[in-house]
């Protein structure tokens, strides 16, 4: 056995996030694996909106990480504002890796610059002030885009 924490990855429903919290996991990793494994799997944004609506207390019980479809800093800010602790990148660094270490470094530099710009545009100095503050996300617009109607 290991003393390292075990974090379930690939969690795709609000119910499963809640279940992981109830079972005592220290964190969960919401991921639809970039939508490439299961067609029509819910995005991290969809799952987070459901968690916020159905089980808002979960954000105080465990850490939540997410990835899937993250291409720009605005995606990172959206996920942070919806309550995640960390955002993973997958496809973008893989594509950048075609150019080796220099390509990945360039990608991360671009994302860092975008993040600084996005934060300045919303009047924040760092991403810690955004985390868990859904007022930075037009959730009604996101709900309309993903679900076709407001959830509340």
Q: What are the language-model segments listed below?
A:
Residues 1-66, 71-95, 142-152:
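Alpha/beta enzyme core
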């Amino acid at each position: 056995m290991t003393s390292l924490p075990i974090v379930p990855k690939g969690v795709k429903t609000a119910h499963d996030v809640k279940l992981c919290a109830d079972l005592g996991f220290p964190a969960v990793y919401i991921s639809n694996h970039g939508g490439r494994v299961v067609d029509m799997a819910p995005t991290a944004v969809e799952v987070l909106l459901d968690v916020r609506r159905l089980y808002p207390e979960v954000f105080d019980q465990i850490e939540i990480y997410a990835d899937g479809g993250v291409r720009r800093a605005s995606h990172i800010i959206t996920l942070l504002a919806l309550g995640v602790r960390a955002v993973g990148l997958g496809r973008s660094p893989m594509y950048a890796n075609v150019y080796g270490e220099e390509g990945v470094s360039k990608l991360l530099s671009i994302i860092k610059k975008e993040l600084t710009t996005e934060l300045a545009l919303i009047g924040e100095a760092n991403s810690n002030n955004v985390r868990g503050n859904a007022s930075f996300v037009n959730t009604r617009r996101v709900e309309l885009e993903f679900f076709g109607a407001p959830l509340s």
